[in-house]
Amino acid sequence: MSVSRDPIGPYHDHLALLHDQLRIAQIAMYRQNRKAIIALEGYDASGKGGVIRELSYAWDPRGFQVYPIGPPAMTEAAHPFLWRFWNRLPTPGQIAVFDRSWYGRLLVERVEQGLPDTEYETSIVEINA
């Protein structure tokens, strides 16, 4: 019995199949006038960019938009916490990919930047609304 010791070969075969499935799903979404949000969350250097790169490789660039989410800009900070996400919701047939999400405020800003209790509680209420 022969066992392949080359992990790259099977990986590339499987990845090519996944790319095909992603492409088919994007076309179906467009034809059915559906929209989707993909929110990636994770530590810095955890692979979020690699996931976005693989999605980008498979999809027609006219059908999706990637939004890197960092600290809110001055104009964003003047609005409710979720405003910057509301303004980036996809239109029918489109996909929005968020590189970090609304949960980041609860996960990262709370620990790293000392998000005040009142803002933390308000964020939870807004997310669950």
Task: Please tell me what each predicted stretch does.
Residues 1-129:
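Glycine-rich phosphate-binding loop of ATP-dependent small-molecule kinases
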